């Protein structure tokens, strides 16, 4: 039985937030009480009172009313890694704050979906990376991958690091973020053959992007029973 899931990527800008929002929306539709967490977010706020766009999306589609300091313990107003941002802004990162927030969310919900920042080797502190956080949370993981040329290399590097860290990898989601690059069925076949892992779905490119339509497409392409969520 899966109690939580960490959504990471093989690169930045591969659509982790869209995939995470799709998962939590479908879980809500299955009458599962799902919590969301994005331990680290970065970028510009829409205004002084708003959250990061990614966090707003996750809270909207999950229906979350949890305190923001649990859902998103750290927000940096510069688009860089937590390690780099904390140095630039002089803001110390407490790893205990992250794990405590996760534990509290887990007590309040059937399960928690956690969206990472960047990829597995994105630094949180000088000697602590996203992969270390996943390992410490002891949480199942899926990897969102794009479809641009070079994706297979990036995916295999990510996969090998998962094995090195003994992470509990559930499989992959292929998200076509641009019209060019790998043909989706070919990419899916390669990833399955090279990793011997599940590819849950391939989401085709959407020229005029609409998140609600994306979530509908995700629902059509994914059999959620494969995730093990129905055992919750």
Regions found by a protein language model. Give the residues of each.
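N-terminal phosphate/diphosphate-binding loop that engages ATP/GTP or pyrophosphate donors
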Residues: 18-92, 103-104
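Conserved glycine(s) of the Walker
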Residues: 14-15
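Charged helix-capping and loop-helix junction motifs
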Residues: 126-132, 156-159, 184-189
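Residues at the beta-strand->loop junction immediately N-terminal to the Walker
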Residues: 8-10
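Phosphate-binding/switch loop-helix module in NTP-utilizing enzymes
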Residues: 81-124, 131
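Inter-motif core of Ras-like GTPase G domains
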Residues: 125-148
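C-terminal lobe/tail of nucleotide-utilizing enzymes
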Residues: 160-232
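Extreme N-terminal starter segment of soluble prokaryotic enzymes
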Residues: 1-6
């Amino acid at each position: 039985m899966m109690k939580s899931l960490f959504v990471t990527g093989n690169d930045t800008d591969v659509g982790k937030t869209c995939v995470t929002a799709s998962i939590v929306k479908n879980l809500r539709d299955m009458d599962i009480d799902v919590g969301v967490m994005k331990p680290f977010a970065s970028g510009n706020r829409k205004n002084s009172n708003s959250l990061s766009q990614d966090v707003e999306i996750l809270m909207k589609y999950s229906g979350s009313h949890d305190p923001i300091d649990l859902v998103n313990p750290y927000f940096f107003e510069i688009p860089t890694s937590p390690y780099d941002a904390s140095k630039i802004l002089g803001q110390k990162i407490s790893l205990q704050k992250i794990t405590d927030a996760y534990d509290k969310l887990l007590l309040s919900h059937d399960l928690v979906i956690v969206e990472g920042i960047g990829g597995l080797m994105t630094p949180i502190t000088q000697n602590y990376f996203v992969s270390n956080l996943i390992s410490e949370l002891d949480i199942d993981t899926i990897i969102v991958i794009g479809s641009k040329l070079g994706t297979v290399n990036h995916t295999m590097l990510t996969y090998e690091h998962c094995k090195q860290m003994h992470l509990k990898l559930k499989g992959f989601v292929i998200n076509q973020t641009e019209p060019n690059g790998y043909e989706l069925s070919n990419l899916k076949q390669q990833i399955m053959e090279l990793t011997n892992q599940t590819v849950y779905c391939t989401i085709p490119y959407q020229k005029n992007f609409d998140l609600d339509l994306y979530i509908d497409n995700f629902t059509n392409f994914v059999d959620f029973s494969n995730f093990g969520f129905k055992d919750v």
